[in-house]
């Protein structure tokens, strides 16, 4: 349920936003939430109850400010007796006035924003005090390099995320 360099915010060009969102939501329903020792599980619990409470607090705050939940939680089977098993969630209609989009939520949830162009995306990507990891998804390597050079981040990926190279030092 948690990854130190997992995707937290997604900015999508308005030209492909609707198609992207439909596919992303569809893929989110493929997660199998459960005991990480079970073979079919591909989404486990968050580390502790206080982490689950923090994640839910940030999501609920965003929802109270107008964010829209895209995932129907009733379509997931999960161990209800364990509150640290969080259903994955996709939030839209999010803004940077929401802590969900500017702080590290660190859970199985993501905010997706429509942007007009790469300049707006870069501005929003840099609107974070952390600048830990960024990932650009494109077919054009020159655009990825151009954006990557403008993003204030310690780690930059093209067409991948949360990847560790054994040749590089990584402390999480």
Which stretches of residues belong to each language-model region?
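Flexible, acidic loop-helix segments that line cofactor/substrate-binding pockets
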Residues: 2-9, 25-57, 74-85, 102-107, ...
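Short beta-strand and adjoining strand-loop segment in the mid-core
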Residues: 9-16, 90
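Glycine-/small-residue-rich active-site loops that bind phosphorylated ligands and cofactors
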Residues: 4, 12, 139
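Glycine/threonine-rich helix-loop capping motifs at alpha-helix boundaries
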Residues: 1-3, 15-43, 57-73, 93-100, ...
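Conserved C-terminal structural/oligomerization subdomain of aldehyde/semialdehyde dehydrogenase
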Residues: 78, 85-172
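Residues in well-ordered alpha-helical elements
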Residues: 14, 18, 53, 60, ...
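Conserved donor-binding loops in enzymes that form glycosidic bonds
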Residues: 14, 45, 111
